[in-house]
From Swiss-Prot:
Belongs to the RimP family. Coiled coil: none annotated. GO terms for cellular component: cytosol. This is Ribosome maturation factor RimP. Gene3D superfamilies: RimP-like superfamily, N-terminal. It is found in: Cytoplasm. Keywords: Cytoplasm, Ribosome biogenesis.
């Protein structure tokens, strides 16, 4: 699928999502699969949690619009889901919701040779992120943080 058609598909799906007070968190099209797999992760615009029913209610109109658009001339699988474990934390709501959960923090390595830190999400302020690493609180300035993701305790 070329970039132009992917962009058209994304706009089409955003319109469907907006009608249901949803937004597209991410869109991934796996053209190396047969049939093509279209993975869509949705979020509610009001910040509430996405339910299984929300995913199901988005699926039918999204599929209908894809069919009407004729952007795909092949068979495809449409997968609708909500944001889940191992996703990046970005919003204030994410940080409040997942306080105490295990996180991976990817660092930019400007001031440190350490690339990743793992711990429990403790606190987020405007200037720093605090994580609990084996009972000790480590404050990391945000200018040193590249990415914060949920993980499992094994990670």
């Amino acid at each position: 699928m070329n970039k132009e058609n992917k962009s058209k598909l994304e706009k089409l799906l955003e319109n469907v999502a907006n009608k249901q007070d949803l937004e597209i968190y991410s869109l991934n099209i796996q053209t190396n699969q047969n049939p093509i797999v279209i993975e869509i992760i949705i979020k509610k615009t009001n910040g509430n949690d996405v339910s299984l029913d929300d995913c199901a209610l988005f699926n039918t109109p999204a599929s209908d619009e894809i069919e009407k658009s004729n952007l795909l001339n092949c068979s495809y699988v449409l997968e609708i889901s909500s944001q889940g474990v191992s996703d990046e934390l970005t919003s204030e709501r994410d940080f409040k919701t997942f306080k105490g959960f295990p996180v991976n923090v990817e660092l930019n390595q400007k001031n440190s040779k350490i690339k990743f830190l793992n711990g429990l999400l403790y606190e987020k302020s405007n200037d720093y992120l605090a994580i609990n690493i084996k009972g000790r609180i480590k404050k990391i300035p945000f200018d040193e943080v590249l990415k914060i993701s949920l993980c499992t305790l094994k990670d």
